[in-house]
A protein has these predicted regions:
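Extended substrate-binding grooves/exosites of carbohydrate-active enzymes
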Residues: 2-41, 201, 316-626, 630-651
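Accessory carbohydrate-binding/adhesion or oligomerization-edge regions at the termini
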Residues: 1-107, 192, 542, 549, ...
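An acidic-aromatic loop/edge-strand motif
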Residues: 95-119, 168-170, 178, 182-242, ...
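Beta-strand-rich binding/interaction modules
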Residues: 157-159, 242-277, 625-629, 633-656, ...
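Accessory beta-strand-rich segments of carbohydrate-active enzymes
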Residues: 2-24, 33, 38-42, 56-60, ...
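Extended acidic/polar, glycine-enriched regions
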Residues: 183-186, 250-330, 682-718
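Beta-strand/loop-rich accessory regions of lumenal/periplasmic or secreted enzymes
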Residues: 91, 97-102, 195, 296, ...
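Catalytic cores of secreted or luminal carbohydrate-active enzymes
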Residues: 205-227, 571-620, 630-638, 643-650, ...
Length: 1004
């Protein structure tokens, strides 16, 4: 970095891209270190002192308003506010500076006319944080180092009134030597944290613009002989059968010291040991390790490397440990391979996010995410768009996830729209800051086997600065490949990336690339944009995996909604998004793109992901099931097949069978005791179930399923024996053995009683031709285009009924017309033909010159006591025509209140496809039953208009109805992106075609 003329902090540093690190110690690996072997075995180091917990803090709107005396004097400490570290200041004290969300635009856009590298002198929230700590004599006799794991966005460090140093970069560690300034007894640490600095121009990620000490703060005590940095590599030879352990040790105080290195397996057995005299700062030790098991996400085999340092007297000064995974990642014949096998990423992008604490991660949350990802067959994570906390990589090593580790660089707002001050581009004044961010990530994370690619950042255009970063990665670590998507936008330096990476590229365009004899394999670094009710058409992407070897998967955008849990004015909990805190400019709910909600509730999108990412395929047949193990390395062992056999919606038999071992890439047919399949519609469903707890997954976890449907439902013949109609002046009534129906001559069915004679309908049904707009609808304009269907649904006049009587049946025919379309009518027919049921038929004649239809159906407003839903169709979770690969046919139940998925912005949700029968009843089983062929059904408390008008689920209060929507079809939901991509034609329904469907209503 640039030579600093003055070594005491000046506010001008905040706007100087060449000043980003002052008096920091060099970057190093994140290995663990201990004073003794006993400490190492207990994983409790006396050489690390946590400073997490209660701190005192002072807020100022900008640096000029922050008193310097707070840095040097303890006089006011007791008057300051207490905060808990780690924290985001916007979550800990929102009255200081409320949360603010923007996507690509910089948060100061429109407030101040700033250009890179300028920083506001008016708005730059500055928080001075104070922590007192005590040190013992043995501690101060060692080198005392302050370790800041993550501070956003810039930090100035003072200890005991002395200025120590300054650092930028919110997501990699900063270390400062405190040795000259600390003493025995009480010491005072002051951190002044700035929300904005030149680094903020490179931290324009699509996330909440927090500031804070969001990772742990600790003191490290380095003994006289200290392993400062450890590098481990594991090259494989002889067709990946021989492994070598290569280590590089950088040791402080190495003179006349020794290092003893030991490699042990999971059981503690020693596989290798060596001793190395240390005479220089840098030493190398290598050895071939026979018989090791290789690391992969399928089989995350880890070994423990222990390095014991001794001084000239032979005394142990330090014990260091790191996990080692033997694996080799490389490009072979233009295909990325792990341990010689073509790899396919079934990945997600994952922001570090907690709805209660912002970017503060806890062990429990990390474990939950990894467990849920593994249960969804996710095998890879892109750390969008910054290095994660170190523990995340350790857990990925242990439980098996591949990682693209991404540098904390995004400058989207500087080039969209394009400016003449795009950063970093080819600007020499930004080059060192770019390299420093990549170097800090690589040096900390280099020993984690889970990391397969280094990423130069995200959406930062292109240019020489990023190219030089990619070259640095290659020089320092030839064992991994380099990723950067920005080359797709700016191809001046195509060699910045080793893989061709795109965002939101359509399937047809991807195929064009793959058919062009490309030089690089293809991955989607972001695809199937999961904003709200989305991920439609995802199966078209995963279908490319078997078709094109150079298609190597992708990473869903993204894992978790970035929604903050707050109390709404009505007292309900709310998951808040941009604009909810008065934060402007904002991009509203555009950061709620997760397959799970902000509180980590899973959605129907997870059902689809779990199925499409499965690596074990189950194909039932008349005698059993064929199981295909598509894993690359792992023999399928320790699983059961749970199966069910149904005929005409009735259970016939079920069981659970031990699955024999199946080698990678092999198949086996498992005979199951079905007997002769009965006539009718026979459904065989098989589930792959984990027999015992394995890794992070609990026993009973279902990882895959397969289903086959044989034959067709036997139709019961029902004689026409309808009760005689009671034809009045205004209404027509029917009273049968299990039927009580009243139809208005104008308006349709107005009364439908259950078998106890209680009313089920609140009002006559309405046409259902539109839906509450999804986020994708709003993005592609479908919310506007569907206006004509809202008009027909809600503003049509219903004609007087045409009553048609035949022997044993009566039909009332209604025509729905609107003045805006004088020559057009939708016809609805109610036919009573038995003592306990009536048929409803909807005829759509076709309407030319109109957009695709969102839906075709009828909406019934039922008595709110009817809340229990039991459905035979595809489930168990919501599904749509373009997102139902992961659903299976069967009986599924839910409560009407849960029929609406609580997306941050209420929208169309809760649909079930392929429905044959659905009942909506009270607790005693009385209510309404609907049956038909291949219906689509939703049951929830809210009308589309109510969902459309609500900004949050908490706005929907006091439901007075249960809404049963019965449709012939619903348009797909789409998901290629959420800002213009249409629903694909094969999942749409042209309005100019005629459609007819019928269903039966029955009282229960």
């Amino acid at each position: 970095m640039k030579q600093i003329a003055r070594e005491r902090f000046e506010t001008a540093w905040l706007s100087n891209p060449e000043i980003f690190s002052v008096h920091e110690l060099p970057d190093c690996s994140d290995h663990a270190f201990y004073a003794t072997m006993a400490e190492a075995d207990a994983d409790a180091s006396s050489l690390v002192k946590s400073l997490d917990g209660a701190w005192k803090a002072h807020f100022a709107m900008n640096p000029s308003e922050a008193p310097d005396t707070l840095l040097t004097s303890a006089a006011l400490d007791e008057t300051l506010r207490e905060i808990q570290v780690p924290c985001e200041f916007q979550m800990e004290a929102p009255e200081w500076d409320p949360p603010h969300y923007v996507n690509t635009q910089y948060p100061w856009d429109g407030h101040e006319a700033l250009q890179a590298p300028q920083v506001s002198e008016v708005y730059n929230p500055t928080v001075t944080c104070i922590r007192h700590f005590a040190l013992s004599l043995p501690q101060v006799q060692q080198r005392t180092v302050l370790h800041l794991a993550g501070v956003e966005a810039a930090v100035l460090v003072y200890v005991n009134g002395h200025e120590v140093g300054y650092a930028e970069d919110s997501f990699t560690p900063h270390r400062f030597d405190l040795t000259p300034y600390v003493h025995v007894g009480e010491n005072r640490l002051a951190l002044r944290v700035f929300k904005r600095c030149t680094g903020s121009w490179m931290e324009d990620q699509d996330f909440w613009r927090f500031s804070g000490i969001h990772r742990s703060v600790s003191l490290h005590f380095y003994p006289e002989t200290h392993l400062y940095d450890l590098r481990v590599r594991t090259p494989l030879t002889d067709n990946y059968t021989r492994a070598t352990l290569e280590t590089r040790l950088r040791v402080m105080g190495a003179s006349l010291s020794k290092a003893k290195l030991t490699l042990t397996d999971k059981a503690g057995k020693t596989l290798w040991a060596a001793e190395k005299p240390l005479t220089a700062l840098e030493s190398y030790v290598s050895a071939e390790i026979p018989g090791v098991k290789l690391w992969s996400a399928e089989e995350p085999n880890l070994y423990t490397l222990t390095v014991v340092l001794t001084n000239a007297q032979g005394q142990v000064t330090e014990v260091c440990r790191t996990k080692v995974g033997f694996r080799q990642f490389e490009m072979k014949d233009k295909i990325m391979c792990l341990n010689g096998k073509r790899i396919v990423f079934h990945g997600v992008n994952r922001h570090e996010f907690d709805c209660d604490r912002g970017r503060v991660m806890t062990h429990g949350l990390l474990m939950r995410d990894i467990r849920d990802m593994k249960a969804m067959n996710i095998n890879a994570v892109r750390t969008c768009h910054y290095p994660n906390t170190s523990e995340f990589y350790r857990l990925c090593d242990e439980y098996g996830l591949y990682v693209i580790d991404e540098a904390n660089i995004e400058t989207h707002g500087s080039w969209q729209p394009m400016h003449d001050w795009v950063v970093p581009d080819n600007r020499p004044e930004w080059q060192e800051a770019v390299l420093a961010r990549g170097r800090a990530m690589l040096e900390r994370d280099k020993n984690h086997p889970c990391i397969l690619l280094w990423s130069c950042g995200n959406e930062s255009w292109g240019g020489k600065d990023l190219y030089e970063l990619s070259q640095y990665y290659r020089r320092e670590d030839p064992t991994r490949l380099v990723h950067y998507e920005g080359v797709a936008n700016d191809p001046r330096y195509p060699d910045t990336t080793d893989v061709h990476s795109n965002m939101y590229r359509r399937v047809a365009s991807i195929e064009e690339y793959l058919q062009s004899n490309p030089d690089k394999p293809f991955i989607n670094c972001e695809y199937t944009h999961a904003m709200g009710n989305s991920c439609g058409g995802m199966s078209l992407y995963t279908a490319l995996e078997d078709k094109y070897p150079m298609y190597q998967g992708g990473f869903i955008w993204d894992y978790v909604d970035q929604a903050l849990r707050v109390k709404a004015p009505n007292g309900q909990e709310r998951l808040a998004y941009g604009g909810d805190f008065g934060d402007k400019p904002t991009d509203w709910q555009f950061n709620t793109n997760g397959i799970i909600l902000g509180d980590r509730t899973q959605t129907g999108k997870c059902q689809e992901v779990r199925y499409l990412f499965r690596d074990v395929f189950l194909t039932p047949d008349e005698t059993g099931v064929t199981v295909k193990n598509r894993r690359l390395f792992q023999t399928l062992t320790g699983y059961d097949v749970r199966w069910t056999l149904e005929c005409d919606r009735k259970p016939i038999s079920a069981g659970e069978t031990l699955l024999p071992d199946i080698a990678p890439g092999e198949s086996a047919h498992i005979d199951l005791p079905f007997g002769t399949l009965p006539e009718g519609q026979t459904v065989v469903t098989c589930f792959l179930v984990l027999r015992e707890k394995t890794g992070i997954l609990e026993a009973g976890t279902v990882l895959s399923h397969g289903q086959t449907v044989f034959g067709a439902m036997k139709k019961a013949e029902t004689p026409d024996n309808a009760p005689a109609p009671v034809i009045g002046d205004c209404n027509v009534g029917f009273r049968g053995e299990g039927l009580g129906v009243l139809l208005a001559r104008r308006g349709g069915i107005i009364s439908f009683r259950d078998r106890l004679g209680r009313e089920t309908l609140l009002r006559a049904p309405q046409l259902s031709l539109f839906r509450a707009s999804t986020d994708n609808d709003r993005g592609n304009g479908n919310n506007i285009r569907q206006g004509v269907y809202h008009l027909i649904s809600r503003h049509s006049a219903c004609s007087d009924a045409d009553i048609q009587q035949e022997a044993g049946r009566t039909t009332l025919v209604y025509r729905y017309t609107t003045p805006m379309l004088p020559d057009f009518a939708v016809t609805v027919r109610y036919t009573v033909h038995s003592q306990d049921a009536l048929d409803v038929t909807v005829d759509w004649p076709g309407l030319p010159n109109q957009p695709d239809m969102p839906a075709l159906g009828l909406s019934f407003q039922l008595d709110p006591r009817l809340t229990r839903v039991r459905c035979y169709g595809y489930g168990p979770d919501e599904n749509y025509i373009d997102r139902r690969e992961g659903a299976y046919l069967g009986w599924h139940s839910w409560n009407a209140a849960d029929g609406m998925t609580r997306y941050c912005k209420p929208q169309e949700s809760g649909n079930r496809t392929g429905v044959q029968v659905v009942s909506v009843t009270d607790a005693d089983g009385h209510g309404v039953e609907i049956s038909g062929d291949n219906l689509e059904v939703s049951v929830q408390p809210w009308l589309p208009e109510e969902l459309e008008a609500a900004y949050h689920p908490s706005d929907l209060m006091g439901s007075v109805r249960t809404v049963l929507d019965v449709a012939m079809f619903r348009k797909g939901i789409g998901g290629d992106d959420s800002w213009g991509a249409p629903v694909l034609p094969q999942f749409c329904y042209p309005a100019d075609k005629p459609y007819t469907f019928t269903f039966t209503m029955k009282a229960l």
